[in-house]
Amino acid sequence: MAKKIAGYIKLQVPAGAANPSPPIGPALGQRGVNIMEFCKAFNAKTQEMEKGMPIPTTITVFSDKSFTFAIATPPASFFLKKAAKIAKGSSTPSQTTAGTVSMAQCREIAEAKFNDLNANDLDQATKIIAGSARSMGLQVTE
């Protein structure tokens, strides 16, 4: 018989740097999950990734206090900031530009994030990433 699901927890956890401090500790502690067990499992699963990269994580907590977790690719904004070599996007995207990214860079990011995007083909995924870049105040060049 399948385990009964008690709830889901969605967090953005830095790769290889999960520790029991907030926000991870309180979120898992409320559900009665063993925090250190999650931290060790998460850090082991993300040790090959760039340290500190934000990883969207969905933790499924079962009624017997056990859990499973699924990780997704980092947010598009993380990749775009890295490609444009900037610390943060523009606070007024329609008026000032924070930097530039090429369509080729958008395509690379779309290839990396394709499974997490709601797109049927790579061209649609590239357009989604280019739209994200524009909303961050980045200029998209051909």
UniProtKB/Swiss-Prot annotation:
Cellular component (GO) terms are:
cytosolic large ribosomal subunit
UniProt's post-translational modification comment states: One or more lysine residues are methylated.
Instruction: List, alphabetically, the CDD domains matched.
Output: Ribosomal_L11
Q: How does it assemble?
A: Part of the ribosomal stalk of the 50S ribosomal subunit. Interacts with L10 and the large rRNA to form the base of the stalk. L10 forms an elongated spine to which L12 dimers bind in a sequential fashion forming a multimeric L10(L12)X complex.
PANTHER family hit by this protein: 60S RIBOSOMAL PROTEIN L12, LARGE RIBOSOMAL SUBUNIT PROTEIN UL11M
List, alphabetically, the PROSITE patterns matched.
Answer: RIBOSOMAL_L11 (PS00359)
Q: Which InterPro entries match?
A: Ribosomal_uL11, Ribosomal_uL11_bac-typ, Ribosomal_uL11_C, Ribosomal_uL11_C_sf, Ribosomal_uL11_CS, Ribosomal_uL11_N, Ribosomal_uL11_N_sf
Q: Does the keyword rRNA-binding apply?
A: yes
Query: What biological processes does GO assign it?
Result: translation
Species name:
Maricaulis maris (strain MCS10)
Q: Which UniProt keywords apply?
A: Methylation, Ribonucleoprotein, Ribosomal protein, RNA-binding, rRNA-binding
**Could you confirm whether the keyword RNA-binding appears in this record?**
yes
What is the recorded function of this protein according to its Swiss-Prot or TrEMBL entry?
Answer: Forms part of the ribosomal stalk which helps the ribosome interact with GTP-bound translation factors.
The source's superkingdom equals Bacteria
Q: What is this protein called?
A: Large ribosomal subunit protein uL11
Q: Which GO terms describe its molecular function?
A: large ribosomal subunit rRNA binding; structural constituent of ribosome
Family note: Belongs to the universal ribosomal protein uL11 family.
